[in-house]
Amino acid sequence: MTKNFRIEKDSMGTIEVPIEALWGAQTQRSIINFSIGEELIPIELIYSLTLIKKAASIANFNLGLIDKRKKDLIVEACTEILDGLHDSQFPLKVWQTGSGTQTNMNVNEVISNIAALKTNSELGSHQPIHPNDDVNKSQSTNDTFPAAIQISVVNEIIKNLVPTIRELTQILDKKSEEWKDLIKIGRTHFQDAVPLTFGQEISGWSEQLKDAENAIIMSLNELYFLPLGGTAVGTGINCPKGFCEESIKSISDDTNLMFYKSKNNFSIMASHDRLAQVMSQIKILAGALFKISNDIKILSSGPRSGIYELIIPQNEPGSSIMPGKVNPTQCEALSMVCAQIMGFEYAVSMANSSGTLQMNEYKPLIGFNILTSLKLLKNVIENFRIKLVDGMEPNQKKMKLNLENSLMLVTAIVPKVGYEKAAEIANLAFKESLNLKEATIKLGYLNEDEFDEAMNINSMI
């Protein structure tokens, strides 16, 4: 009978590993010991760790610490991982050691075994590439894992989230310009206020998103400084001079992003204030999107018993019992994602404040929450733009009706009659179901010509 496992050995003894798995003993122990939940370490984080391993091998070769054959084998293995050929070989859960050591070893072991396959060596033999002595040379999980989180977060924000936000603000700006002359009633406290244009209202949404985007980009500044070379506690034990600079140069070349050596490894390794700051700005973006989704839900309410100044695309039936009902489902999906991100931010803040002495032991949670938030935001913003914003249209007839019926237009005649008389006019109009002109004339405060001259809606914009 063919065995479906092989026997591997580590410092704790022997263990059975699936026969075709490219991971090794330490990864297998993590699978057994941490069967918790379904959340896996994000593949983006795996790729960033792999980038570090590739860069480290080049640095170690340039410093004369490994030979060219070992360097080439590690680089080839890393290239295959970065090409997505081995995604299934990274099965570890987020809920593991707080340093991320098991995931670091998962990457080390897979690289080692890819090299073994390329040289017809036995899986798990650690030949010709040893996961610790070669792949992990000059490194510790304590410096590589936080560096990998930082690289992943910067990469995801700059290359994915920011372009997605800009696509949304561009369409909002286009619609703002298109409807710049469409006058509607404004609302504060859910009550009628003075008029504005629909273009102005939409411009507020767009600018709010641009402000959030800029704040996120600014918060990234400190993430470009990596703690590589700090090794175990920040002192750089077992890391040769020049390794950090060599590694970071390779990472910068591979990502087309400019990373630098950290000014103080002790700070970055013991706490993740910089990551928490980025997550805080991500939460602010979520808050802006939440507000916009709520505005659209309110403005599109109806169609006959609500405000209904905004017509949204009808993508699917809204009810299993009420025929013809269409709901603002894209807004609801966006709101749920934003609520989830706000919860993630709280967890990151709590995790960041809970580190001890020379290390924060919540690294997998912090990395997972931030990267998951970024992916969710990218997906939901794109969906929101395509399925709702692109197709939304103003209900000009309802806007005109609501504008003409609003008692708050009385604000326009305050300069003529004063605040107290204007309030009296509005109250009379409401109580006796009069329009503002009728109420003003009835009270004798202005004649018809004086009212018409004062009631210039365009002058209120």
Across the structure, where does each feature detected by a protein language model lie?
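Conserved, well-structured ligand/cofactor-binding cores
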Residues: 1-461
